[in-house]
């Protein structure tokens, strides 16, 4: 029996649908239903359900975007850092394997030395490396409470990110989720609805690919640890717009901010993460996702507008 925390959220609902298609027995629990101080109650829930695995999709992202986290810092911290810590402790006590949906939004800009940011790179868009959004700070802290630490390495371009002992579960980094279903949380929908766009290059995660890759970690019993679960490659905002227009999803006149300074002055309350992640670790354990342009093409070919 898989316990799915955050089963009513954007990503959690899709995990549940995936489990149904796969015939995986699961029980959903809302992350909000837990008093984060009542660890005994959480432990008893997992015991009573005879859980064989825990997937944590619960977290606090802010609606409509991360700016909202700046106004609700207590709940943001609880959902993104306190809850993962409780899950680690309880699952450790019960010997239950777990997976936690983290975020690639703990990095920004280009990686020193080139290439995409790797799992063993310390976050550079965090409370320890400001400025950052409060959301990103709490997501980086969420990895810290799961046992990861920044370590200075002689001769390295950037500090490393290492577990304090041995990794105990899966940490899956999601990055700018999208799929074929029009939704306020879908990146492709956001691009179509924003009045003005910021030009940036990013890694993205197609949600069906993301969920299948996460579950494959359990199925293949790959080593515990952090995995960047994004579609290989990267894409710019203008490339996404071109694909949206190409597939006829929305042919409006798209406008862009002149630069990030104008974006921050007119449309944002907190800095944004724009980055590219390296996916070679996931591929190295035999888990492959479609290239990002292919995944975007497919999602827009099968686009389902909101009713």
Residue ranges and their predicted role:
Residues 20, 24-45, 59:
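Adenosine-cofactor binding site in Rossmann-like domains, unifying the SAM/SAH pocket
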Residues 38, 82-86, 97, 136, ...:
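Conserved cofactor-binding/catalytic machinery of classical short-chain dehydrogenase/reductase
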Residues 71-78, 82, 105-172:
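Catalytic helix-loop patch of NAD(P)-dependent Rossmann-fold dehydrogenases
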Residues 39-81, 86, 92:
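NAD(P)H-binding glycine-rich loop region in Rossmannoid oxidoreductase-like domains
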Residues 1-22:
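N-terminal Rossmann NAD(P)H-binding glycine-rich loop of SDR-like oxidoreductase domains
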Residues 213-269, 273, 298, 304-307:
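Mid/C-terminal beta-alpha module of Rossmann-like enzyme folds, strongest
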Residues 112-113, 144-212:
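NAD(P)-dependent short-chain dehydrogenase/reductase
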Residues 5, 29, 54-58, 98-104, ...:
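SDR active-site strand-loop-helix element
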